[in-house]
């Protein structure tokens, strides 16, 4: 670029070019995924709480400073819709969460198509999607979370970890953003 380029001359004169590296850093930083922001939220260090989910036993345990304070039966992801295994942290709390994928199509207050996955099939004309309620939702990985739901005694969910409503509320009330969640086989 020559010194005759008007854009370059404007940048040099206004000293805006000094801000470009800073702006670049901030624009890349905004692409960071939420779990990587762990330094900004509680990792269990200050609250001392941790959730451990056992897929084999279909059970979730809540620990406080290493001591078991609550346990609950669960229903994890069914075959083909497995709950992810690994170490995560609570990245969102939503007391009255609604599914954005699973629910019913409703028209005029009446269900016209029930138990749908919006990624499959079409929406009936004039209808609106109504997501399934997922009370006491604790998101720990992408679309996955712990929440109140049906507990049939075996893996039956679409990947989330369902708990009885009373226990879901207890876990919800006890944890903060950043609380570790360990999901093991």
Model-based region annotation:
Residues 1-13:
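N-terminal secretory signal peptides that target proteins for export/translocation
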Residues 39-63:
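Post-signal peptide N-terminal segment of mature Sec-exported envelope proteins
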Residues 97-104:
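Short acidic, Gly/Pro-enriched loop/turn segments at secondary-structure junctions
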